[in-house]
Amino acid sequence: MQRWINNIWYGSNPIKWLLVPLSGLFWLISSLRRKKFAGSPSASEALGVPVIIVGNITVGGSGKTPMVIYLIELLRRQGYRPGVISRGYGVKIDGVKLVEAQASAVDVGDEPAMIVARTQVPMAVGPDRLAAVSLLQRHYDIDVIISDDGLQHYKLTRDIELVIIDGARRFGNGYLLPAGPLREGLWRLKTIDWLINNGGKAQDNEVLMQLEPKPLLKVKSSQPGLESLDKALPVVAMAGIGNPARFFDSLSGQGYQLKHTLAFDDHQAFDAQALIALAGDLPLIMTEKDAIKCRDFAQDNWWYLPVNARLNADFDKALLARLAPLVQIKP
């Protein structure tokens, strides 16, 4: 299903023309939602803590999670105490809940589980993001909120908006849902603070973000293992993310010999026996987000590829300069 949809959004499938009228309806509904919350006070005024949105205007993965981790580490180096909120996509969450250090992706979602496993940041998940902020404030002394996604969640006031785009696929065919991948029109990019280009050629007013691969780690232990994986050996690669081809290309570019590639839907739950059968006796390499969902049944020869976001120092300075006066505002 995901491949068929991507062919409509990023290819030349003529079915998109049948969906354009529905895109008009989507535009009307989303416009009414925006107007409902227009003129809301900033988060630093309304909540007593500034909110940084890390979102996108397209459906699917664009690199938000590495950017969230990058911001957590950047802010901590400057002495800030960030907390993170998320919807927890792919799972049903009643109310809001804190994400514990060893939280299961089944309970909180794969991205929140990965973020906390990597950073141990205070984090809350749930469909009501304002309630998630309140829960964090009751349990932790935080001075900045990072919202993982939520650009279109206008009920949540915000101070800074970062939009991440896939530098290769960009905006697809340029149509709103369901004819295209856009959650909002391209006009929305004129209202944000920074447009982050993940892995493409940055155009005017775009900040380039590169994902730097790190050494492979064992899915079972998140440790390197006694021996590194020999790149001369054939391997199986799998990815359940928005753009699996990007991951496979990254592995090939590092010299791994991909015998088979397995592309799954984003946020897809995995069956242990099915993956064992698909990989056979070959080493299996997956994304860090997928590893979070597989660690309870991982085999000894299963590995994952961590990546770190890298942005230029000018962006860091500009963001910190924008943030500093907001942290001092109290309701």
From Swiss-Prot:
Reactions the enzyme catalyzes: a lipid A disaccharide + ATP = a lipid IVA + ADP + H(+)
Listed EC numbers: 2.7.1.130
Associated pathway: Glycolipid biosynthesis; lipid IV(A) biosynthesis; lipid IV(A) from (3R)-3-hydroxytetradecanoyl-[acyl-carrier-protein] and UDP-N-acetyl-alpha-D-glucosamine: step 6/6
Residues annotated as binding ATP: T58, V59, G60, G61, S62, G63, K64, T65
Enzyme superclass (EC): transferase
Keywords: ATP-binding, Kinase, Lipid A biosynthesis, Lipid biosynthesis, Lipid metabolism, Nucleotide-binding, Transferase
Keyword Nucleotide-binding among record annotations: yes
PANTHER family documented for this protein: TETRAACYLDISACCHARIDE 4'-KINASE, TETRAACYLDISACCHARIDE 4'-KINASE, MITOCHONDRIAL-RELATED
Role played: Transfers the gamma-phosphate of ATP to the 4'-position of a tetraacyldisaccharide 1-phosphate intermediate (termed DS-1-P) to form tetraacyldisaccharide 1,4'-bis-phosphate (lipid IVA).
UniProt similarity note: Belongs to the LpxK family.
Protein name: Tetraacyldisaccharide 4'-kinase
